[in-house]
């Protein structure tokens, strides 16, 4: 069984019930979520050994979060404790022409005050096959960025494959450095890079030539994105695979979804899914990443199948409430075979 380590921040998610706006809500629905933790949950669901690493405060909310992760089979034995609080994010789910809104309350969280040397990465990576991080973590604080680099360098030294989701969040970079300043050194240590057209442009100034996926409602011309992939590989020669997710947003409840994968001079394109009646798109990219890691580990000689698994897994996530993608390998494979009818399974 392959062992995957993920590192980042997990937060308390407080969502308005249904489609209520913040000013209408009299209560909030509490769950947990965070990019790297969401990936770990997906991988545990698929039967891999998944360990999530973070810094927790010592309080009952953190203990509840840990128990929640354990309930999905995610290990937390390498987590460290200290700091003041668990971060929080508030979610207002959009509908039709009204987009969803997220308000963060994560300043001074435990991971925001993490420092190099607090985590023994040599021990964390014992027996590990894969390490995953996202661009959200180095955006939190200089300390979080330093520890992320520390982890990547240890993984490289120990022969552990490294993946990243660029995941650019402009509102998080508040500690005096920009993503363009910090990310290149981190991404240079990655074997697999995932992003979208906005990530590539905002962080590295790389654009698809003459194509805007948002203007075409998700009609994907894969060749237009080959230039993004080749430019990323030229900038980061360690990378063996570059993957671009392609989301077309017709409205808040109706998206198109697909992706392309570039490796060894070949560009693979997934089927394009038309996702109507979205239940919850938060965690959609994380479910793609979880599916991709599983696919690349399970189908090492079949990049097309790995990509198709990632897209199908993420498509199913859009039907599930909460950050986590709670589906099985069999359910994903059924959708890959074309079984998207939604009929009762007996």
Regions found by a protein language model. Give the residues of each.
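Positively charged, low-complexity intrinsically disordered leader regions
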Residues: 1-21
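Alpha-helix C-terminal capping segments
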Residues: 38-49, 295-299
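Hydrophobic beta-strand scaffold residues
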Residues: 50, 76, 162-163, 194
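A short helix->loop->beta-strand "cap" motif at the edges of active sites that frequently abuts
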Residues: 154-161, 236-240
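Conserved phosphate/ATP/ADP-binding segment of small-molecule kinases
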Residues: 172-264
